[in-house]
C-alpha cells in the first residue's frame, strides 16, 4: 500500500486529458451506483476504496490503467495480467479505453472486489485469513 503526505487535487491527473477524464467519470459513476466509496488521490494514482482499496486508476493520455482485487482468479476480456499475491489474493490488471469497456461482466467483478474492499468477502468453505 503506497502512502504520500502530499495533497494532490484530483483534477491534476486530468490536465490536458479530457478523454481520460470522461472515462474516469464513467468508471467512478458505475462504482458509486453500487454504493459510497472514498476517492484517495496520490501523485501517481487514484485509489477507490471502502474500508480498503479495491480498485483505482492510473491516468494515461486517453485511457485508464486499473486493477481490481479479488479473492479468486477471474477472467474478463480486458484483463492484461493476473497476479497471485499471497495465498488467495488476486490482482487483475486491465485498461479502459472506451465507456463500453465498463460492461456488465466488469461491473459484476467490481461488485465482488468491493466486498473485498469492505473486508466482507470470505470464500465459501474457507476460514477468515
Report residues per predicted region.
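Charge-dense, helix-prone N-terminal extensions
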Residues: 1-129
Amino acid at each position: 500500500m503506497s502512502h504520500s503526505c502530499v495533497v494532490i487535487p484530483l483534477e491534476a491527473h486530468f490536465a490536458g486529458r479530457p478523454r481520460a477524464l470522461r472515462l474516469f467519470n464513467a468508471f467512478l459513476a458505475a462504482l458509486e451506483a453500487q454504493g459510497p466509496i472514498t476517492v484517495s488521490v496520490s501523485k501517481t494514482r487514484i485509489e477507490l476504496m471502502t474500508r480498503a482499496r479495491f480498485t483505482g486508476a492510473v491516468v494515461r493520455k486517453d485511457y485508464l490503467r486499473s486493477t481490481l482485487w479479488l479473492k479468486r482468479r477471474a477472467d474478463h476480456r480486458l484483463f492484461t495480467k493476473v497476479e497471485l499475491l499471497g495465498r488467495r489474493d488476486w490482482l487483475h490488471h486491465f485498461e479502459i479505453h472506451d465507456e463500453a469497456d465498463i460492461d456488465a461482466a466488469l461491473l459484476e467483478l467490481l461488485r465482488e472486489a468491493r466486498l473485498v474492499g469492505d473486508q466482507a468477502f470470505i470464500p465459501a468453505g474457507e476460514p477468515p485469513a
